[in-house]
């Protein structure tokens, strides 16, 4: 919040562009993260209770007077799960695949955040503060490498690789059932472990950074060309022809 209104150059295609604020750039990611978290939270996992091939065969053979679909739905819902009215031997895991896909999307936003912070550090727009006893670089004492953001990016990439493997596998099972998804699902814990490691790295890295206010404002003051968008808009408003070329 302290630096949320700090004006700074924006960069499109790596070149100075119409200005932004530090707070605006962070709020972009806050907005995106919330968007994907809301989608993830909205997805309820499903359950089924309709027998070995999903047809209530044994249920009806044992007791024909019971409405097994209604009873099964009541039982599944009592476990906090949404009821799957259609399945094979297994619950078809489309909801799980949808949740994994949204988790993949969220991870991409976090990777984008880690890379943007990395770039701002490389421009010296953000400074990293070392704690006592920390080493910034193994051989170059003048450096403070952005290892927390690099670690987060790497671990999120591994998590995304596992998500793709899981998502692609769990939606496919031969006829009424095969076990090829079983060994894949054993990796779901590893997947979320990589995400947790990444989140901890991001939290650690964010705690170290602060803006280099002097350099940010100096670069902004030396980049008057970024006003051309605003100037040409005013010229167009006032009917000046070919304003883009004239400003260029």
How would you describe each model-predicted region?
Residues 1-7, 11, 37, 41-44, ...:
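Long, hydrophobic, amphipathic alpha-helical segments used as structural scaffolds
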Residues 3-25, 49-64, 126-141, 178-184, ...:
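Charge-rich, acidic-biased intrinsically disordered regions
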Residues 1-17, 79-95, 175-179:
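Long, non-coiled-coil amphipathic alpha-helical linker/lever segments
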Residues 18-169:
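Internal glycine-rich alpha/beta core junctions
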Residues 124-125, 138-248:
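Glycine-rich cofactor/substrate-binding loops
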